[in-house]
Each structure stands twice: as structure tokens, then as C-alpha cells.
Swiss-Prot record:
Pfam families: DUF525. Residues 3-127 form the ApaG domain. This is Protein ApaG. NCBIfam families: PRK05461.1.
Length: 127
């Protein structure tokens, strides 16, 4: 896969703890995350697949891959953005996620959009 300036995707993330869906006594901590994918390049591109690495506070790692996001493979023209919200369940009060999207420009060039690590944490538990 290539990475070049004409194919540039920016990814911004916010996450929150969902107390009403969690069960602390059972070690079930539910988090929602909202992702903004922005095409900062100068060519249209489609999100083809996602690759996640999810790590809990005990160091347990789970890998998740799949086509598109939330059942879609959005195509973004330059200057366009796509937002979606999804969720993850951890067995600990803290963790992190990171990964990348496989993208394809309209000319068939494949490239990667990096998803930088972000924290999942129950409020008032981050050390």
C-alpha cells in the first residue's frame, strides 16, 4: 500500500464510558467511540476495511478486522468527512484502541489511514 500527499485521510476520535450499559460487578465496561474521518487529500477515496488492536489494562489484546465501518464503505471526496459511533466492551476499567483503515483512491491506488492510539477509561480511574 502506498502513502502519498494526494491521498491523505485524517482521523479524529472521542470516547466515553457508558455506565448504564456496564456492570462493574461482572467486570463489564462498555465504551462508545465516535470517529471523524476527513479527506484532507486531493483525490476521492473509499474506506475499504478496518483493522483494530484493542488492549485492556491487563495487557489482553484483541484484534478486530472487517469490511468498512458500521456496514458502510464510505467514499469521501476531498474536503468531505464521515462520522460514525461504535462501541467496545472491556473487562477492565481502562484500555486503549489503535489501528488503521485500508483506503482506495478512485484511481485504484491503495493506501493506509492510521488510527492513533486512544484511551478508554472509566471517569476518575486514569492514573
Amino acid at each position: 500500500m502506498e502513502n502519498n500527499p494526494s491521498s491523505k485521510i485524517e482521523v479524529a476520535i472521542s470516547s466515553r464510558f457508558l455506565d448504564h450499559q456496564s456492570n462493574r460487578n461482572e467486570g463489564r465496561y462498555v465504551f462508545a467511540y465516535t470517529i471523524r474521518i476527513y479527506n484532507a487529500g486531493n483525490v476521492p477515496a473509499r474506506l475499504i476495511a478496518r483493522h483494530w488492536q484493542i488492549t485492556d489494562a491487563n495487557g489482553k489484546v484483541e484484534y478486530v478486522t472487517g469490511e468498512g465501518v458500521i456496514g458502510e464503505q464510505p467514499r469521501l471526496r476531498p474536503g468531505e468527512e464521515f462520522r460514525y459511533t461504535s462501541g467496545v466492551v472491556l473487562g477492565t476499567e481502562q484500555g486503549q484502541m489503535q489501528g488503521h483503515y485500508d483506503m482506495m483512491a478512485d484511481d485504484g491506488t491503495e493506501f493506509t489511514a492510521t488510527i492513533a492510539p486512544f484511551v478508554l477509561s472509566v471517569p476518575r480511574t486514569l492514573h
